[in-house]
Curated annotation (Swiss-Prot):
Keyword set, alphabetical order: Cytoplasm, DNA damage, DNA repair, Hydrolase
Gene3D superfamilies for the chain: Uracil-DNA glycosylase-like domain
Pfam families to which the protein is assigned, alphabetical: UDG
EC number: 3.2.2.27
Protein name per its UniProtKB record: Uracil-DNA glycosylase
Compartment(s) where it occurs, according to its Swiss-Prot or TrEMBL record: Cytoplasm
Catalytic activity annotation: Hydrolyzes single-stranded DNA or mismatched double-stranded DNA and polynucleotides, releasing free uracil
Alphabetized GO MF terms: uracil DNA N-glycosylase activity
InterPro entries attached to this UniProt entry: UDG_fam1 (IPR002043), Ura-DNA_Glyclase_AS (IPR018085), Uracil-DNA_glycosylase-like (IPR005122), Uracil-DNA_glycosylase-like_sf (IPR036895)
Lineage of the species this protein comes from: Bacteria, Pseudomonadati, Pseudomonadota, Gammaproteobacteria, Enterobacterales
Subcellular location, principal: cytoplasm
Function: Excises uracil residues from the DNA which can arise as a result of misincorporation of dUMP residues by DNA polymerase or due to deamination of cytosine.
Length: 229
């Protein structure tokens, strides 16, 4: 492993900042008062659990966790096995079908196998109230995930950032394009996918970049863990 720094090494100080402690306290208070918050507490930081800092090859930025029952589990765009694949992820699968030879759309939307290969699936806000999109957008999560992006930018080299939609592109404005590979396209949402997400070829381009820099390409076919099959 070329880079042995862990998320704990680089984020321990940030997690003691007053704003971050306040964010955690606000979320905990809402849960304790009976408000349903997604994802479940144990899953809020799954993006970091499944993809260690030294293993990050690709970053895909989402925005808000899914706010429907049983959907969000801490990985952007991903849903738990047994939950219907959401429209944006279906459009990601469609782009994969059109560009990756042999890719066949899976019957689930669980992307842990991407995360285990080094794809950091990072929502920029890490919690949401049930049924209320963007309800936690101003709690401080954006400050925290800005820091995460700046730490990847600083401590890693040659990471591919896939920035889909204006929110992700603004969020990624700090990335040093001399050190990293930044690809931009419209969001895969049904509202914007036809404006240039389809045909962006990002999954192919990401793998080409990784191979050119001596990294193993990503197998974009999502595979369920053996125990879920």
């Amino acid at each position: 492993m070329a880079n042995e720094l862990t998320w704990h090494d680089v984020l321990a100080e940030e997690k003691q900042q007053p704003y971050f402690l306040n964010t955690l306290q606000t979320v905990a208070s809402e849960r304790q008062s009976g408000v349903t918050i997604y994802p479940p507490q144990k899953d809020v930081f799954n993006a970091f659990r499944f993809t260690e800092l030294g293993d990050v090859k690709v970053v895909i930025l989402g925005q808000d966790p899914y706010h429907g029952p049983g959907q969000a589990h801490g990985l952007a765009f991903s849903v738990r096995p047994g939950i219907a694949t959401p429209p944006s992820l279906l459009n990601m699968y469609k782009e994969l079908e059109n560009t990756i030879p042999g890719f066949t759309r899976p019957n689930h939307g669980y992307l842990e196998s991407w995360a285990r290969q080094g794809v950091l699936l990072l929502n920029t806000v890490l919690t949401v109230r049930a049924g209320q999109a963007h309800s936690h957008a101003s709690l401080g999560w954006e400050t925290f995930t800005d820091k995460v992006i700046s730490l990847i930018n600083q401590h890693r080299e040659g990471v591919v950032f896939l920035l889909w939609g204006s929110h992700a592109q603004k969020k990624g404005a700090i990335i040093d394009k001399q050190r990293h590979h930044v690809l931009k396209a419209p969001h895969p949402s049904p509202l914007s996918a036809h404006r240039g997400f389809f045909g962006c070829n990002h999954f192919v381009l990401a793998n080409q970049w990784l191979e050119q820099h001596g990294e193993t390409p990503i197998d974009w076919m999502p595979v369920l863990p053996a125990e879920s099959e």
